[in-house]
């Protein structure tokens, strides 16, 4: 079984990623990875280019995003299908149009409304689960 990266940032995740979508595809191909996800912060800026380049390179692309959630947590979302892509687009639009914060942020209500076709990962070290566990909160 091959290793698959499900949480990858490109240079569209400012201060968090340095590679272009094309560079990510090139490295994945070099290492024989059959699948690769792109999960930039709060945006899908490189998603279409990434998808097209991955398919042309014989790599199965997974589109997603790492979003900022209320409570100052991160949540990584992957699109399972076109319904997931549509849900993620609607969620990101709602986040960017919301006046909840000085930066795009999702509320649980937004996620409840726009979740069809999405897969949620437990997240990076700034995810809700890792943060609560690091505080000793096991409930």
Which sequence ranges carry the predicted segments?
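Phosphodiester-processing cores and adjacent nucleic acid-binding clamps
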Residues: 1-139
